[in-house]
UniProtKB/Swiss-Prot annotation:
Gene3D superfamilies: Glycoside hydrolase/deacetylase (3.20.20.370). Forms a complex composed of PxpA, PxpB and PxpC. GO terms for molecular function: 5-oxoprolinase (ATP-hydrolyzing) activity; ATP binding. Its EC number is 3.5.2.9. One of its GO terms (biological process) is carbohydrate metabolic process. It holds the Pfam family LamB_YcsF. It catalyses: 5-oxo-L-proline + ATP + 2 H2O = L-glutamate + ADP + phosphate + H(+). This is 5-oxoprolinase subunit A. It comes from the Bacteria.
């Protein structure tokens, strides 16, 4: 069994360099919610050094709230903003001898494209326009995954080690109780259940079906690195290979 392990980087966390030794894919902030040209260059350089797949992490234009504010923008605006961000990272990667492999939206853009078909279409269209060979990463079973498949893109369905799930397979909003799993044992058990058995227990107790092709690790938690190391160790014990 194989699984991709990804992390969002270039967002101001001190653990970026160490996380890049543990993950197989890096989603690099492109300036709209965090990061800038220099952090993008630095993250690309470290990803290449560690053999980690380079990906863009585009966002709504919302540095004030770290890309977590809901926005109702025209799809054409979202298309242009996404193309701008992923195009910048693709060029930075190419300039350093690397290749951008995937795109994963950030924050509220990620959440809204999971449910809003027009927004999902705008993202998928931008990714296709940039490079049809790019992999589009989105929430398992989401509108974004459906849109990517409609454009003929390779898609990668994502699950979260430390997020609570609702009965329909969507994430519990961060503003609600149960959104974040802070117990390491619970997060580890949830991850293995999703990867090995394709299901997750919702906060209301029902099982939701999920397709786990990549697992997101958040690097901003207090015990993020320790959990990442433990997850890698557990995967090795279960003969689950970590690779992009």
């Amino acid at each position: 069994m194989k699984i991709d392990l990804n992390a969002d980087l270039g967002e101001g966390c001190a653990s970026d360099a160490e996380l890049l030794t543990l993950v197989s894919s890096a989603n690099i902030a492109c300036g709209f919610h965090a990061g800038d040209a220099q952090t993008m260059q630095a993250c690309v350089r470290e990803a290449i050094k560690n053999g980690v797949a380079i990906g863009a992490h585009p966002s709504f234009p919302d540095r004030e709230n770290f890309g977590r504010s809901a926005m109702q923008l025209p799809p054409e605006t979202v298309y242009a903003q996404t193309l701008y961000q992923i195009g910048a990272l693709a060029t930075i990667a190419r300039a350093q001898g690397g290749v951008m492999r995937h795109v994963k939206p950030h924050g509220m853009l990620y959440n809204q494209t999971a449910k809003e078909a027009q927004l999902a279409d705008a993202i998928a269209r931008a990714v296709y326009a940039c490079d049809p060979a790019l992999v589009l990463v989105g929430l398992a079973g989401s509108e974004l995954i459906r849109a990517g498949k409609q454009y003929g893109l390779t898609t990668r369905e994502e699950v979260f080690a430390d997020r609570g799930y609702q009965a329909d397979g969507s994430l519990v909003p961060r503003s609600q109780p149960g959104a974040l799993i802070e117990n390491e044992e619970q997060a580890l058990a949830q991850t293995l259940e999703m990867v090995q058995h394709g299901r997750v227990k919702s906060i209301t107790g029902e099982w939701a079906t999920v397709t786990a092709q990549t697992v997101c690790l958040h690097g901003d938690g207090e015990h993020a690195l320790a959990f990442a190391r433990r997850l890698r160790s557990t995967f090795a014990e279960k003969e689950i290979v970590v690779a992009a």
